[in-house]
Amino acid sequence: MAAASSLSRHDFNVLEKIKDPESNPLTAVIVDSTLPKDPNITDTSVYDRVSKKERDIVLAMQQLEMQLAGLRPASTTEPIEEYRQCVSRLGELISEYPDYASARNNRAQALRRLYGDTMLLTGVHNPNRLLRDLDGAETSQVATLALSDLDKAITLLTPKSLFASISPQAGKTLSMAHTQRAAIYHMTAKSFQPGHVPSVPERKEAEWTKIEFEEAASRDFALGGRYGNEIAKGLAVSTNPTAKLCGQMVREAMKKEYGPAYAE
């Protein structure tokens, strides 16, 4: 026990950095509740109006989810078609307010629900998606749209510097956007087989290998964790084989150097 406690704060920070490559004790996120809820819609009345429209659409989708799960009486015979109409309504809101990141994040989430997290790989079965018998061209367009929405949401909300503040609402949306993109990358990596070519020809991911999807998923999980999602933070290392291997090697070396007390 005494040997393990001889590690300095710097030693622990270095070891934590190996276990969590995105961690940095000097650059914690600065949350400021006095900032506008969305940095790109600073007029309170406009934000309230836009966010209410979004909430109404999201509530409608949540009610459809409950209907699909059998948790509430059916109010429509075509819940999936109504779900798609909700996505179209989000699209209209985004067209009117293209810099409203939350709507983009929610549209990406709805597209994941409809088309599944393996949407980048044509022909891969995903039992969790709502739509069946998907057309390859349609799925490719949707995959590009979902990733573009998440890219844009992340760009819109990411603080301009490591020491810039972010509002709680913007931080939550940013965390969700990183985590959603990570989920898509992670499921793509899990389903990736030799010969697979991601069906997003105009995007960088079209050239990625399985390991590149794994690494990108880990980075996004880490950033999702940095902005508040503890589950994403935990997944950051477990989904990165390089970090896992490195962490295991370092832990074994430290156990030999400092004794069993460093086991954790």
Task: Tell me the role of every PLM-derived stretch.
Residues 99-100, 157, 166, 173, ...:
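Short helix-capping/linker turns of helical repeat alpha-solenoids
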Residues 1-147, 151-158, 162, 244-264:
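N-terminal alpha-helical interaction modules that lie
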Residues 120, 194, 233-235, 245:
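Intrinsically disordered, low-complexity regions enriched in proline, serine, glycine
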Residues 147-154, 208-233, 237-240, 250-257:
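TPR/TPR-like (Sel1-like) alpha-helical repeat modules
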Residues 190-211:
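Active-site-adjacent loop and "lid" segments of alpha/beta metabolic enzymes
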